[in-house]
Amino acid sequence: MSFFENTRKPVGLGGKIMVAMMNFGHSAMAEWGLSFLQPAPDAMVLDCGCGGGANIKTLLKLCPNGKVQGIDYSAVSVEKTRKVNAGAIAAGRCTVQQASVAELPFEAEQFDVVTAFETVYFWPELAQNFREVYRVLKPGGIFFICNEANGETAKDDKWTQIIDGMAIYTDTALKEYLEKAGFCQIQSHKNKKGWLCVTAQKR
């Protein structure tokens, strides 16, 4: 397995290095994307594909009276996220578990917000996975997607060739999947760096 395969599912030493790099390398994009999200101070949030845990730490600050849960199907990512957010976990404001978006381990209508930073590229069945997100969101809840690649630049093709199982979606493609899953009020934002943020609301 090449080092870059760890972007999909971090494992071993290479995976530990990758999740540490994720926390630093994606911070500017995450900050930009979160400018389009205004969660309530007491929001219940789920971060799907929590990677190195930095975004959960930020979400906990944005929701000082809320709780944030995280899932990742990489044991390395779960371990790192728990370390980064150990204080919040001890305080009962955060839980992190190994799980897949294909079958979220939550009851229906639990969350006000579900976030997905740099992860939908690797989701196995986007249509079904979006329906799972829809299921666990409360009515009126927000699904937030933030990607460094918007599917419209030459460099995007390079990454899909290097990383097996990676698919980069345009905002138009994501909107189609979201609408089929039942979402409404879909909005997309792009910048000159090619970053993409999409928000969608559960009916």
Task: Enumerate the language-model features and the residues they cover.
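Conserved alpha-helix/loop element of class I SAM-dependent methyltransferases that forms part
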Residues: 24-43, 58
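Short glycine-dipeptide loop
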Residues: 42, 65, 137-142
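A short glycine-rich, Lys/Arg-flanked "PGG" loop and its adjoining helix->strand segment in the class I
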Residues: 127-139
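A short acidic, Gly/Pro-enriched loop at the edge of an enzyme's catalytic core
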Residues: 102-113
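A short SAM/SAH-binding and catalytic strip from SAM-dependent methyltransferases
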Residues: 113-125
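Class I SAM-dependent methyltransferase SAM/SAH-binding core
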Residues: 44-103
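C-terminal alpha-helical "lid/dimerization" subdomain adjacent to the S-adenosyl-L-methionine
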Residues: 4, 10-23, 27, 142-199
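Conserved H-loop
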Residues: 40, 90-91, 184
